């Protein structure tokens, strides 16, 4: 019989961040208890505070991880698109489609992003969100080779995608746009 694998502190930290991301995505910063996070992660609350000094530290770690996932998504899709085309519009489109696939595969990525934006009333959280959002902007601009206006359009469309995705099942980008143009929203 082989002995059970003991997780390192780094592995346990990663598990706690993953559990926190799920809880914070649903309940937000203020509405999520560290007890719920500890239970989901399978650790005690005192151990959670050993790993992360405060609830805010844990929230910030989850937000950073969420932005890193989004950045990796943009980097990977941008690099692949650049092998097929040097046209910035084509590269941006590929990155946008990859982002939609990321949100569809893991809706908590979007939910946590939105919770991060909502928690920006806190100066420390705002600083982390701002820095990471700027890094996303820089990554998209550099990888796509697009001019600043095109990058601005990419992020504006991304925010619209975020709104449509957060509305929930049954609403598509196309029928949402139709409703913005004067029709009634249609549920699929």
Predicted regions and their residues:
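Short alpha-helical scaffolding segments that buttress acidic/His motifs in well-ordered protein cores
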Residues: 99, 113-117, 154-158
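Short, basic, alpha-helical segments at the C-terminal edge of helix-turn-helix-like DNA-binding modules
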Residues: 64-70
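Helix-turn-helix
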Residues: 12-15, 19, 23-57, 61
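Amphipathic alpha-helical segments used for helix-helix packing
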Residues: 103-121
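Actinobacteria-biased recognition of intrinsically disordered, low-complexity terminal regions
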Residues: 1-11, 182-188
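Hydrophobic alpha-helical connector segments
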Residues: 61, 72-105
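Hydrophobic/aromatic-rich alpha-helical bundle segments in the mid-to-C-terminal region
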Residues: 122-188
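Solvent-exposed, amphipathic alpha-helical segments
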Residues: 19, 23-26, 73-80, 112-116
């Amino acid at each position: 019989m082989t002995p059970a694998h003991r997780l390192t502190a780094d592995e346990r930290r990663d598990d706690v961040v993953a559990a926190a991301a799920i809880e914070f995505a649903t309940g937000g910063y203020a509405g999520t208890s560290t007890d719920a996070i500890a239970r989901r992660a399978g650790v005690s609350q005192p151990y959670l505070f050993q790993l992360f000094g405060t609830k805010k530290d844990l929230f910030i770690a989850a937000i950073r991880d969420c932005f890193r996932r989004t950045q990796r998504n943009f980097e990977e899709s941008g690099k692949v698109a650049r092998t097929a085309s040097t046209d910035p519009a084509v590269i941006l489109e590929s990155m946008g489609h990859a982002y939609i696939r990321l949100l569809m595969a893991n809706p908590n990525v979007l939910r946590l992003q939105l919770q991060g934006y909502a928690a920006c009333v806190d100066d420390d959280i705002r600083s982390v969100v701002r820095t990471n959002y700027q890094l996303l902007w820089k990554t998209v601009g550099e990888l796509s080779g697009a001019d600043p206006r095109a990058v601005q359009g990419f992020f504006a469309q991304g925010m619209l995608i975020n709104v449509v995705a957060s509305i929930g099942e049954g609403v598509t980008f196309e029928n949402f746009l139709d409703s913005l143009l004067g029709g009634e929203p249609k549920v699929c």
